[in-house]
């Protein structure tokens, strides 16, 4: 039976994971919806990076699907992997046009994996941050 300290630590890790994960999830959901709605700034941004406007909705759907997979506890690791690929593409796209915003997808990826790290003990076993 876990001690009171262990269960408090587990609860604390769980809450930290929710907070850390909420930041990129809120950003990704709002960006995905913006791609579906297609306001002028989104279309202008796509034009600046050299993407066809026909990709806006497709990328918005992809972004929302990957985020939904991340939000489902049973598929959260798969969602993190999918979002890593998506955000990697975003990073390269920004770097290709010398856009200084290339760091934003990297930070989102760190938050995605950080939130998952706090709530997924199997991930902590695979990537230990300290030696026992």
PLM feature spans:
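A generic alpha-helix surface/boundary motif
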Residues: 27, 39-40, 62-64, 86
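Core segments of alpha-helical transmembrane spans in multipass integral membrane proteins
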Residues: 30, 51-71, 78, 110
